[in-house]
């Protein structure tokens, strides 16, 4: 029930992102390889995780480029099993280790990276808001140095420049399922794919 709040909103809710992704992968032999705190733990709340390799995401290194690198490493390990590797990739995290996209392309590591593109270092946004409130300074300037806007980043184009199929940016919730389906088909064919989804903060 809670997952349906803002279901048709744009930017896309993190609950819808996770629900739509699970609908596409649930009948596959899948492995989620990214942390889930950034998406309010929706995968744990909505997905059936029954095998130990289905969630190998949280390593405690959030916000320092952990997710992208760990996910590509896990995808390399999963490749020999023919397992569909999926990462819900935070945008600020990816920017710290952007070269990992080239690594995935160069070594032909099949992975579906679904961008949680909330256009900011959202973990820091919330921290700055808490600190500003604590010191009674207001939060109207919390975006300075913590958001990624003016211009917005097109991660699909960055992926293409690194040799990976880039899909998006997806801003309309109705376009999400077809984009994920296309991406999964390509990954199952052995390609790394990035689907850029413009999302709400959490």
Model-derived regions: residue spans:
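Active-site diphosphate/adenylate-binding microenvironment
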Residues: 1-77
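Thiamine diphosphate
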Residues: 42-201
């Amino acid at each position: 029930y809670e997952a349906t709040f803002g279901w048709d909103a744009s930017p896309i809710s993190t609950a819808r992102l996770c629900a739509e992704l699970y609908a596409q992968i649930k009948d596959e032999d899948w492995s989620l390889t990214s942390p889930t705190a950034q998406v309010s733990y929706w995968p744990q709340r909505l997905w059936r995780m029954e095998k130990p390799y289905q969630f190998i995401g949280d390593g405690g290194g959030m916000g320092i480029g952990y997710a992208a690198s760990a996910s590509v490493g896990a995808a390399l390990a999963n490749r020999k099993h023919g397992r569909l590797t999926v990462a819900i990739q935070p945008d600020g995290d990816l920017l710290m280790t952007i070269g990992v996209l080239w690594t995935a392309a160069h070594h032909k590591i099949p992975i579906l990276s679904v961008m949680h593109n909330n256009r900011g270092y959202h973990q820091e946004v919330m921290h700055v808001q808490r600190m500003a409130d604590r010191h009674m300074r207001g939060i109207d300037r919390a975006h300075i140095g913590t958001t990624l806007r003016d211009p917005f980043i097109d991660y699909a184009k960055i992926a293409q420049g690194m040799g990976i199929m880039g899909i998006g940016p997806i801003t309309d919730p109705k376009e999400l399922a077809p984009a994920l389906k296309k991406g999964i088909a390509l990954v199952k064919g052995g390609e790394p794919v990035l689907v850029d989804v413009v999302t709400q903060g959490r």
